[in-house]
Amino acid sequence: MKIALLHFSFEDYTIELANALANYVDLTLIQPHKVAETCQDALDPRIQVCSFKKPRIRDPRNIFSMVEMMQIIRSVRPDVLHVQETNDFWYDLTLLFNTMPPLVTTIHDVFRHPGDQQTPPGAEFTRRISFYRSQQLIVHARSLQETLVKQFRVPPRRVNVIPHGELGSLYQRRASGTPPEREPHTLLFFGRIWAYKGLRYLLEAMPLITAQIPNAKLIIAGRGEELNQYFPNGHDEKHIELLNNFIPVNEVAGLFQRSAISVLPYIESSQSGVAALAYGLGTPVIASNLGGLREIVHHQQDGILVPPRDVQALADAIVKLLDDQVLQHQMRTSTLERCQNDLNWQKIAIQTLELYQKAILASKSTLGHWG
């Protein structure tokens, strides 16, 4: 089977999926030049790579970019085109006005997150084109499946739940130096710092935590919102370590390996690449009990779920886990077991192959030959 995998972003996810799929199909990865630089050293050599120029989103030269992209797709002549959600209205309009091969689209987020400043204007509406033009859709949580079926009236037979695979293995390969020692009282808040991530609730919980565990420390690693709003009078350097910038890829694994817990106090969630990364590095997760988080975190097995916006419950859960080394060890073991089961990329690739077959059959019955 010949597959074309197209992505504009979600590089980590795409790398791991592509490497797993390469064991089963003839795979061509299609991507913008600027994304290719991120992926080039991490891809299986069996994967053919095609790149195209992609200007900034408001640049009208995107018309020519989409023409080049379509020329690549037609030259590959794939049995299936699998697209990672693009958040790009130029692609969406190209999809609307062109005949495509059997199409599978992975939808990572049905709606834009609160505080999202990166999704281009208009993409919130044009992205719906892919909901209806795709023969099969992939989401990473049942809650997203339900949204597509109930709010967007996508037929249930076309919406499939496949877990978000673990990302720890990728970052272990990228890491430099010896893995650090696990710090039994260190917490990690990692990733984009946007309103929906709920950092304010974790910061409000910190005094409650340190009152019971004086040597507890929180690492805040990532960029996004201006952190001065959280620390108008400066931060407590004894208990908070700020890394308010882009974290180099060779340093990411070390942050999770240092930390006893990855904390995700989100107030809204579709799915979570951060949880998938934490589990791949053997770090338990304490997260809000909502959205896709309640599906990826197995409560009391590999993490703890707490009510969103509940500072006391969040503090209690963190203290409980920080104070129990045996429980930490049990949960670390469980996270790594998950990476050999539902979060394993080979298993995810096999599930994805089944959807490719479904997409081909659906396309034959409705669209006929393309190209």
Per-segment meaning from a language model:
Residues F10, S65, V83-W90, I107:
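Short His-centered aromatic/hydrophobic patch
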Residues V67, Q71, P120-L137:
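Membrane-proximal helix-turn-helix segments that form the acceptor-binding/catalytic region
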Residues D116, V149-K150, R157-R158, P163-E183, ...:
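Acidic anion/phosphate-binding donor-loop and adjacent secondary structure
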Residues P179-K197, L203-M206:
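Conserved donor-binding/catalytic core segment of Leloir-type glycosyltransferases
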Residues Q229-A253:
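Nucleotide-activated donor-binding/catalytic signature segment of Leloir-type glycosyltransferases, i.e.
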Residues G254-S270, T283:
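Acidic donor-binding loop of glycosyltransferase active sites
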Residues P284-A287, V297:
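Short hydrophobic beta-strand element within catalytic cores of glycosyltransferases
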Residues H299-Q300, I304-V311, K320-V326:
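Conserved acidic donor-binding segment of nucleotide-sugar-dependent glycosyltransferases
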